Structures are given as C-alpha cells and as structure tokens.
Amino acid sequence: MRSPVDAPCVWITTLRADGSPHTTPVWFVATGDTFWVASAATNVKVRNALADDRVSLAIDGSGADPHVAQGNVVVHHDIAGFPDVVSLFMQKYDGWNLLDATVDGARVLLEISIERWLLGGP
C-alpha cells in the first residue's frame, strides 16, 4: 500500500450507548488529516457517532502495514454541501454517487478528524 488513504476500505469503530465497540468496514476518502465516510443515515455507526463523537480507524488489517488512528467525528446531513468530497468518492469508487439515495436511503457524511495515530500514519 502506497499510503493509508489508498486502501479500499477502513475499519471504523464507534461506541454504543453502553460503551461497547461497534466495528465495521467502510469505504472512505481523505483530505489532509480528515477522513470522510458516507453512510446510510439509519446505520448504527451514525446513531453511535451522534451520541459519542469518539471513533477509531484501522487500515490494512493484514498486519503487513497497519495504520490505527483515534479521532472525533461530526455527522453532516447535507452531503450535497460537500461537492469536493462527493467527487473524491466518485473518483475512488468507480463513479459511485453517494447522493443517490435509491439503494440505502438518505446518506450522511461522517467527517473524522484524526487526533492521534497509534500505528503508522500518513
């Protein structure tokens, strides 16, 4: 992997109300030290992020070149207000248009600011 941002997916961990972790793989793009994840608005990770903004990200779970970060998330409901991020998703994922709500319903953008790299880094 040339850079962690070139990975096809990242594992995001959010915290449930009882403090237990919820971990799932997601598509992502990055701008500087900010990672962006698009998700259906009704997903568990979104509910968790709205209640507790702490998250962790893990990239390349094979162990060959691991990257693990901690950060904070802001949930944006108006994804059309982020055309540059929408364009990055389309470029990285073969034209995938996250504005198209016909498959999963309305989507949100998770804006994740990296506070600290625990392993690796950009």
Question: Model-derived features: where do they sit?
Answer:
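Short, charged N-terminal helix-start/capping segments
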Residues: 40-45, 87, 91
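Charged, gly/pro-rich active-site loop segments
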Residues: 64-122
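Acidic-histidine catalytic/liganding microenvironments
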Residues: 52
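Short beta-strand segments
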Residues: 7-41, 47, 55-59, 68-69
